[in-house]
Amino acid sequence: MAKNRNLVFFLGVLASFTLSSFPVTVSGEPPILFTFGDSSYDVGNTKFFSSEFDPATTWPYGDSIDDPSGRWSDGHIVPDFVGRLIGHREPIPPVLDPKADLSRGASFAIAGAVVLGSQSTTASMNFGQQISKFLELHKQWTDKERAEAIYMVNIGAEDYLNFAKAHPNANTVEQLTQVAHVLQRIPRELTSLYRAGGARKFAVQNLGPLGCLPIVRQEFKTGENCMEMVNFMVKTHNERLSRLLVAITVPLLYRGFRYSLFDFNGEILRRINEPSLHGYTDTTTSCCGTGSRNAYGCGYSNVHAKLCSYQKSFLFFDGRHNTEKTDEEVANLFYSGDKHVVSPMNIKDLVGKAATDLLAQEI
């Protein structure tokens, strides 16, 4: 059934490209795709990494595609749709799957991933460990393939959610210190990909309004409001991340470094604030779960979680992850949106840029 669903998944893109072809690199082939991040980009690495129970491998996860594959959604997620849009017939596989064909790329993202160290030595890989895993394998692809590849990154949410749980009464200075620590590490890892891995094209998704997640509203009992402390850290993070990416492109040391920065935060807030305009009936409660915001326990057999009757009417599938509908909209904007939502270029334009300076320069 899953194979049939993947065929349907690919055929779906053909209708959207009846008047145009897939974008290709200067070599004439769809670019290889690599993804890094947390559960929002995890396509199944968690189930191979840990022997602990992974709820994303059980129903109702994957309900919309009849395949609970380890994605934290009712169906496909952002990297799946982006991969399809750039011409891949099948979703990019999890790198930890021993049977995976990595010739088209791989997902290094895993649930629970953080930037600052690892909150658990047994249940996740932090951002740096994901980069290290890529560097272990990078000779499987040629210099040219790695230079023309797209490197999708979505990381940092767990750092701020964990901080809020541990320090719910943190003052502004402490919050800004946390942001500074996170943003000291991210550029270091990106430039490691550039120098040692030969990466040139980065597609970075900024952080959504984490304080508005159903699980945060439920756990912190914020009622109809979002948790302002978390959203303040996220807002500061996103503003500084934008400036850091601009700064990386300036020095001659990083010649050929190109990027797309997608305003995920803005798009989610627009949907929360104007649900009917985007076809939603609920943007504050989860489709699957239990509790005041239906935000806890999805996928756990010992929890009497409820499942909504129509996932496409919900923004969130579980307490902190989007529905497939939401992720498809996000991917389409990331791929071909204008500069109000993705800058300085979208992924479609990024793919078409010639990759220069294929070998990283040594200091």
Curated annotation (Swiss-Prot):
Q: Does the keyword Hydrolase apply?
A: yes
> Which keywords accompany this UniProt record?
Hydrolase, Lipid degradation, Lipid metabolism, Secreted, Signal
Q: Which GO terms describe its molecular function?
A: hydrolase activity, acting on ester bonds
Matches recorded under InterPro entries: GDSL, GLIP1-5/GLL25, SGNH_hydro_sf, SGNH_plant_lipase-like
Annotated Gene Ontology cellular components are: extracellular region; plant-type vacuole
EC number, as in UniProt: 3.1.1.-
- CDD domains for the chain: SGNH_plant_lipase_like (cd01837)
- Report the domain of life of the source organism: Eukaryota
Which residues does the entry assign to the active site, renumbered to this chain?
A: S39, D318, H321
Xref: Pfam families: Lipase_GDSL
Q: Where in the cell is it found?
A: Secreted
* A single BP term in Gene Ontology: lipid catabolic process
Q: Where is the signal peptide?
A: 1-28
Q: Does the keyword Lipid metabolism apply?
A: yes
The record's similarity note reads:
Belongs to the 'GDSL' lipolytic enzyme family.
Q: What's the protein name? A: GDSL esterase/lipase At3g14220
Q: Which organism is it from?
A: Arabidopsis thaliana (Mouse-ear cress)
